[in-house]
A protein has these predicted regions:
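Short beta-strand segments enriched in small/hydrophobic residues
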Residues: 21-31
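Sec-exported extracytoplasmic/periplasmic mature domains
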Residues: 8-16, 43, 47, 69-76, ...
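Short beta-strand elements in bilobed, periplasmic/extracellular small-molecule ligand-binding domains
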Residues: 23-25, 42-62
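Hydrophobic alpha-helical segments within soluble ligand-binding/sensing domains
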Residues: 1-20, 65, 113-118, 133-151
Length: 186
């Protein structure tokens, strides 16, 4: 669902017609089912709108950095989508190191993440939309599942749905978004 939400944010920003728009995806490690679902959701949503996924890179942020720099030179894109927090931070670092952002003028960044750094750059306008997983709730769900397994001696694990918010610069300071971004302060 998070991937589909990113695709919808891109479609909304570009008027649902992405024909001819070139997209690059930083897909994180695809060994986790949740990451596979994010990738499937975003790539299907973009293709249905006419966008061309020029390339996608799989792996952890540090391991794909060199490949990204090469691809960015050989196959520049109009839209960058980072499916994980570290990958979104890597893109922000990439933009920051570029003579004050000529790439920002021709490339829109969308990502998943909740770090202070990503929220700061969303507020600054470098990230167009950030999908923010409710990590506080995710931790609660995990502890609840562990407690039930210990109490009832269950061996099975099941998937849980993680809630998330789609945040753009305009709505960053809305009360419901602030509760998710800064749960301890509340």
């Amino acid at each position: 669902e998070m991937g589909a939400a990113l695709a919808q944010a891109v479609q909304s920003d570009f008027g649902d017609d992405l024909a001819g728009k070139r997209v690059g995806i930083l897909a994180c490690s695809q060994s986790q089912r949740s990451m596979q679902q994010r990738y499937t959701g975003v790539s299907q949503g973009l293709r249905e709108s006419g966008a061309v996924v020029e390339w996608s890179l799989e792996g952890k942020a540090e391991s794909i950095k060199d490949a990204f720099y090469t691809l960015e030179q050989d196959k520049p894109v109009d839209i960058l989508i980072a499916l994980g927090n570290d990958e979104t931070e890597m893109m922000v670092d990439f933009f920051a190191g570029d003579e004050l952002g000529w790439r920002l003028d021709r490339c829109s960044l969308y990502g998943v993440g909740s770090s202070e750094k990503n929220v700061y750059y969303l507020d600054k306008g470098w990230i167009q939309t950030l999908v923010v997983p409710n990590e506080f709730n995710m931790g609660y769900q995990s502890m609840e599942a562990i407690a039930k397994q210990l109490i009832y001696h269950m061996d099975t694990t099941r998937s849980s749905k993680v809630n998330y918010l789609v945040v753009d610069r305009e709505h960053l300071y809305d009360a419901d978004i602030q509760k998710v971004l800064f749960p301890i302060v509340q």
